[in-house]
C-alpha cells in the first residue's frame, strides 16, 4: 500500500493556484456524475451505445464549462518570494 501512495505522490503534479484546484474539483464532479448517470442510463436501457453517448455528452459539458474559463484559473495571485539580491543587499 505504501508503494501506491509513493507512486501517486510522484505522478500527481502540483496545483499552483487555488482556482485551479476548484476547476479540478469541478471537472471531477462533472465527469464522476456523468459516468454514474451514463452507466445507469445504459444499464436500464440495455444499450452500450447509449452509455457511450451519454458519457460523451458529460465529457463535452465538462469541456464547455472548464476550458474557456482560462482567466478564472488566475483570479487569486500567488505571493512570490523576493529575490535573494534584495535580501543580501543590506548586509
Curated annotation (Swiss-Prot):
Its main location: endoplasmic reticulum. It comes from the Eukaryota. Residues 1-28, 72-91 are cytoplasmic. GO terms for cellular component: signal peptidase complex. It is a multi-pass membrane protein. Residues 49-51 are lumenal. The chain crosses the membrane at residues 29-48, 52-71. Keywords: Endoplasmic reticulum, Membrane, Transmembrane, Transmembrane helix. InterPro entries: Spc1/SPCS1. The keyword Flavoprotein does not apply. It is found in: Endoplasmic reticulum membrane. GO terms for biological process: protein targeting to ER; signal peptide processing. Belongs to the SPCS1 family. Component of the signal peptidase complex (SPC) composed of a catalytic subunit SEC11 and three accessory subunits SPC1, SPC2 and SPC3. The complex induces a local thinning of the ER membrane which is used to measure the length of the signal peptide (SP) h-region of protein substrates. This ensures the selectivity of the complex towards h-regions shorter than 18-20 amino acids. SPC associates with the translocon complex. Component of the signal peptidase complex (SPC) which catalyzes the cleavage of N-terminal signal sequences from nascent proteins as they are translocated into the lumen of the endoplasmic reticulum. Dispensable for SPC enzymatic activity. This is Signal peptidase complex subunit 1. The lineage of its organism: Eukaryota, Fungi, Dikarya, Ascomycota, Saccharomycotina. The gene is SPC1.
